[in-house]
A protein has these predicted regions:
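Bacterial Sec-dependent N-terminal signal peptides
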Residues: 1-23
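Beta-propeller folds
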Residues: 19-438
Length: 440
């Protein structure tokens, strides 16, 4: 209700501001998209390149390579109309392998909740032969049904994904062989590698599955929601998406939904050794009713970062765990008088010797720089403004890049701080710069 009221208030204020300007508005102008902010979307830098990026064409039939320098197209990387053994005419999204030699193409995307969806994925190799030609063959990732959250291994030789709440692994070097990593996944009971509804909604993520830096281990969060109360609501045919099964009579949708004071999922972190096929449970020290909103492997394959929150969500702890011994060591704690924002999790970026952390400990959201041992090296930003997104660190000149609202709460600009602490604004035009448009 609060979200609806806020949205309505925003619309009314927006309309009122236009009315005060003397320009009358009509319904057609409001719904036509005339007032939608202008922006660039779908720009994906090509890994290991540094000079080019890619975009889908408007028809979603091609992936085109562009030059950063000129903004002009260089070549078509993929074309559904000409690719060999391609069974689809259009696609929904795509991603690159870390080395930039493969494309993972998503089709038949079906939404589940706010961030989650299933899709049928295909692999397309960008490797060239001695004549500089791509083999132009499309291969299905799996014949077992639609997948969730597929992710490449760092060496690009494997893809892990989730289907029916279980984790699967496809190895390209072994004829795209598929093996099952977990066995106990079950709807409304156990989820492996994907969050339950509460985690997805409150912590804004849809994948709880990571490869180690050396591609030898998989880490994942297991969600046991067997003790979470169920909630049901009627489902109708609707229009987006149109559910044919309920055209004449409504159906029921039942899922696990913990109301205030009810039990949440029991969460645990596990690792899977790809070679030995051994699964281990990590020894994480956390409250019985606490949360694990993120896990992430560092550059060191023997250090798995595990982030925990207490039930009140005002105390964050980060542990480094050894994926084989399962021993975990606390390296950081951050506390808030109110709560820890979920944006904090995604602003933790690991480098070989350091990691970044964004905190409100000073009263404003600012960037801090830590050693991998958990020692605070310095506070990078300071002042009466908020750092919104940490974009990255340049090891060559020890510079930090971030967005902040220093000029206005209504704007977000890109800044750089060099090794001497000098801050430079990099974005010339006023507006809002989304982190996905500049972070690489």
């Amino acid at each position: 209700m609060k979200k609806i009221s806020f949205a309505l208030l925003f619309c009314l204020c927006t309309l009122a501001s236009f009315a005060q300007s003397g320009k009358p508005l009509n319904l057609k102008e409001i719904v036509s998209g005339e007032f939608i902010p202008q922006g660039i979307s779908g720009v994906i830098p090509i890994p290991g390149d540094g000079e080019h990026y890619s975009q889908m064409n408007v028809d979603k039939t091609q992936i085109i390579k562009y030059s950063f320098k000129t903004g002009k197209p260089v070549e078509v990387l993929f074309d559904a109309a000409t690719a060999r053994e391609c069974t689809f005419k259009t696609f929904d999204s795509y991603s690159f392998s870390p080395d930039g030699t493969k494309l993972l193409i998503a089709t038949e995307t079906t939404p589940i909740y706010r961030h989650s969806y299933t899709a049928v994925h295909y692999i397309y190799s960008l490797k060239r032969n001695i004549n500089g030609e791509i083999n132009n063959i499309v291969e299905k990732l799996s014949d077992g049904g639609p997948q969730q959250v597929p992710v490449f291994s760092p060496d690009g030789t494997m893809v892990a994904f989730v289907r029916d709440n279980n984790i699967y692994l496809v190895k390209f070097l072994y004829g795209n062989s598929e093996s099952q990593v977990t066995e106990d996944g079950k709807r409304n009971a156990v989820l492996n590698g994907i969050p339950d509804w509460v985690y997805e909604e409150e912590f804004s993520f849809n994948r709880a599955l990571e490869f180690s830096a050396d591609s030898k281990m998989i880490a994942y969060i297991r969600f046991d929601e067997t003790e979470v109360p169920s909630y049901s609501f009627p489902v109708f045919a609707g229009s987006n998406p149109h559910i044919t099964a309920f055209e004449k009579y409504p159906g029921d949708y039942t899922y696990k939904y913990p109301k205030t004071g009810e039990a949440n999922s029991k969460v645990s972190v596990h690792t899977f050794d790809i070679k030995s096929k051994v699964t281990r449970k990590m020894q994480v020290q956390m409250d019985a009713d606490g949360y694990i909103p993120r896990i992430r492997f560092t550059h060191d394959p023997n250090k798995l970062a595990i982030i925990t929150l207490n039930r009140h969500q005002n105390r964050l702890d980060m542990y480094f765990g050894d994926p084989r011994s399962t021993v975990c060591k606390q390296v950081l704690r951050d506390e808030s008088d109110a709560y820890i924002k979920e944006a904090v999790f995604d602003n933790i970026i690991f480098y070989p010797e350091n990691f970044s952390f964004v905190s409100e400990k000073s009263g404003y959201n600012h960037l801090y720089w830590y050693s991998m041992g958990g020692n605070l090296l310095k506070q990078v930003t300071a002042g009466n403004y908020e750092v919104k997104d940490f974009l990255g660190w340049d090891a060559d000149d020890n510079s930090f890049y971030f967005t902040s609202n220093e000029e206005s709460p209504l704007r977000k600009a890109v800044y750089k701080i060099d090794r001497k602490g000098k801050k430079t604004k990099l974005s010339a035009q006023p507006g809002i710069i989304p982190p996905s448009s500049v972070r690489t």
